[in-house]
Amino acid sequence: MDQLKIAIFGSSGAIGSALCRKYIQQENVEKVYCFSRQITEVKHEKAHCFILDYLDEENLSTISSEINFSFDIILISIGALLNPEKSIKDLNVEKFNNMISANTLPTLLIGKYFLPKLNKNRISKFASLSARVGSISDNFLGGWYSYRASKSALNMIIKNFSIEINRTNKYSIIFGLHPGTVPSKLSDPVKIKNK
């Protein structure tokens, strides 16, 4: 059985680092490529860690062009959540634009340069962490305008990836994951504010 090659973007965060640690323990995994804006605290012979600005398209292009192999799994664990609006009165255009950018552009750019790196000879997976609050049909509480809109946009990006990649890679599976609320630097400020 071939050994898996896995890429994890956002590997210094709570979920990303946990995924890195989990995958390096699996016998069927050859290498885990950990990408993050900060140093990833995962030390293991299977882990190859890189510091990467997800919004630096030139850097993403360079790194992807230097990779001469395919990935079996690509996971994106990147996002932002700051001071969600409880009412439309709380909306701030600059914060809205920042939220949309933070929760969509990294996945778009990673997809642009790394979707072609998915293994075309066997089942390969590309997943991005999203959030259930991005669901239009599941929104019964309202509020959180910027975050909800950014996650809805991310969900549409993931759906578009799935449609497009299926035309060229019949073995690929593209999907979004809803991890729920995970204790982390991302969710802690919201929990404190809502107490």
Describe each PLM feature range.
Residues 179-189:
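Short, flexible catalytic-loop segment of classical short-chain dehydrogenase/reductase
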Residues 111-112, 159:
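A short, exposed helix-loop element centered on a Lys and neighboring polar residues
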Residues 24-42:
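Conserved glycine-rich Rossmann-like NAD(P)H-binding loop of the short-chain dehydrogenase/reductase
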Residues 8-25:
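N-terminal Rossmann NAD(P)H-binding glycine-rich loop of SDR-like oxidoreductase domains
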Residues 80, 87-101, 123-167, 180:
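Catalytic loop of short-chain dehydrogenase/reductase
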Residues 26, 113-122, 168:
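A short helix-coil junction within the Rossmann-fold of NAD(P)-dependent oxidoreductases
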Residues 43-58:
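Rossmann-fold cofactor-recognition segment
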